[in-house]
Each structure stands twice: as C-alpha cells, then as structure tokens.
Amino acid sequence: MTALDAVLRRQSHSKVTADAPSRLQLLPYVEAAATVADHSGLKPWRLIELRGDARVRLGAAFAEASGAEGKDAEKAGAKPLRAELLIAVVFVHKPSFKVPAWEQEAVASGVAHTRSLLLDEAGWGVFWRTGVLTRSEPVHRMHELAPNEQLLGWLYVGGLPEKTKSDKRKRLEVGRYLTTLS
C-alpha cells in the first residue's frame, strides 16, 4: 500500500475495542514524529499517554471544566473512557525569533495527524477529539502542562471492532480546494 492509499482509506473509528498498543509498540510512532516538517528543528510538541486511572482523572477534569452536575457530570466524565488509550498532543512553544508560535503549533498538529495515519495504517482504530474543554484550566492542570504548553486534543486509540462500517465519503471537488495564482 502506498502512502496515498493509506491516507485515502483512513477513517475515524469512534467505537473501538479494549485492545490498545503497548507503550513499546508506540515508540516507533513517536520516533517518526521527528520527520514532520519542522522549521529550525524545534520539536515544539510532546505526547502524553493516558491509560487506566489517568482517563478517569481526565473525566473528572472534564466534569469540573464543564460545570456540569449529576448525570451531565457523569456523561462528561465518561468521555475519556471510550478508548483504553488516549494520546494527548501538546504544543510546546519554544522561544524563537525565526519560527512564530503559529508555525510551531502547526508542527504539533502535523505530529497529531501523522500519528493518527500511522496508527490507522497499522490496523488500530483511531479518532481525534477536541472541544471547548480542551484548553480549560482543569484539563490543563490535569495534564500537568507547563505555562508554555497548550493541549491540542487527544487521539483515542483502540482495536477495531469486527464489524466496522466503511466510511462512504463524498468525493472532494478538488478544484474548489486547489487554485492557481497567475
């Protein structure tokens, strides 16, 4: 399979099984992050593995950040339990006169999406999650982020269910997205 084939067949899997890659299995995917285009090689990112109780603590941070109570708090708290492994993607701003913050954040975003593609290609179910609580103070605190760090979101990773629906995407009208300046 070519890289193009892998990208074209990639789809999010919002329902995954309890299987998840081990830390050892993740290491090559983390190493591959060094290949993302990165002006000045700043590596303005880091990844955080969340398993087990860390997911429960994230759920509590979601509930706190949302201000929800009762069933709504339970619902917010259950969101991180949809996969056995969550990989938090963190933008780490590095002081640089050559590379502005927006460009560094773009590198961290590239790391996130490259991880998603690699995990999908390896046969794992992956979906990307963000939302209004992503950069809230309780969620920031739960991830033990430094002042120069911002959370971008999470890759939820698990096994693929036996019956996985094929994503029937509409074909892209490429002419709308690729224009030419003359």
Regions found by a protein language model. Give the residues of each.
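Small-aliphatic-rich amphipathic alpha-helix that forms the alpha element of a beta-alpha
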Residues: A33, I87, H93-M142
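Short, charged/polar surface micro-motifs in flexible loops or helix N-caps
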Residues: G52-R57, E64, H93-P95, E137, ...
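Structural motif
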Residues: E84-I87, G153
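Short, electropositive alpha-helical surface patch
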Residues: P138-L152
